[in-house]
Amino acid sequence: MLQPKKTKFRKAHKGRVHGLAYRGSSLSFGQFGLKAMATARITARQIEAARRAMTRHIKRGGRVWIRIFPDVPVSQKPAEVRQGKGKGSPEFWIARVKPGRILYEMEGVDEQLAREAMQRAAAKLPVKTKFIVREGG
């Protein structure tokens, strides 16, 4: 699963995700893409599950790019522990996603197969998405 090799700080504030994505909002590598239509916090496990669903559907054909990276640690306290006594330890990593962000890109397969693969991937993600195709050739 994806996670940073090294971070400046061990724990992060929860924060809020506001606004639209301007960076990473257009296709850079592939012919087809999956674009987020809403704000979301996507975990490393969800990113990997969607990637697996996609690559298994296209079998050996094509190439897939993951355009998001989980760089925010989320801390949790253990079950049945009283409040207080400091913040919990980091348990998993998330990527904060804004509307308009490209999540995955794909090339080397026909559009129908790419659309089906992206639909399978979208089913694994906690955000409404849209299938997009590169304009002009």
Swiss-Prot record:
GO biological process terms held by the UniProt record: translation
CDD domains: Ribosomal_L16_L10e
Keyword Mitochondrion appears in the UniProt entry: no
GO MF annotation: an example: rRNA binding
UniProt entry tagged with the keyword Ribosomal protein: yes
Pfam families: Ribosomal_L16
Domain of life assignment: Bacteria
Gene3D superfamilies membership: Ribosomal protein L10e/L16
Database matches in InterPro entries: Ribosomal_uL16, Ribosomal_uL16_bact-type, Ribosomal_uL16_CS, Ribosomal_uL16_dom, Ribosomal_uL16_sf
SUPFAM superfamilies to which the protein is assigned, alphabetical: Ribosomal protein L16p/L10e
CC per GO annotation: cytosolic large ribosomal subunit
Keywords, sorted A to Z: Ribonucleoprotein, Ribosomal protein, RNA-binding, rRNA-binding, tRNA-binding
Assembly information from the UniProt record: Part of the 50S ribosomal subunit.
Role, per record: Binds 23S rRNA and is also seen to make contacts with the A and possibly P site tRNAs.
Family recorded in the similarity comment: Belongs to the universal ribosomal protein uL16 family.
Identification of the protein by name: Large ribosomal subunit protein uL16
Provenance organism: Magnetococcus marinus (strain ATCC BAA-1437 / JCM 17883 / MC-1)
Lineage: Bacteria, Pseudomonadati, Pseudomonadota, Alphaproteobacteria, Magnetococcales
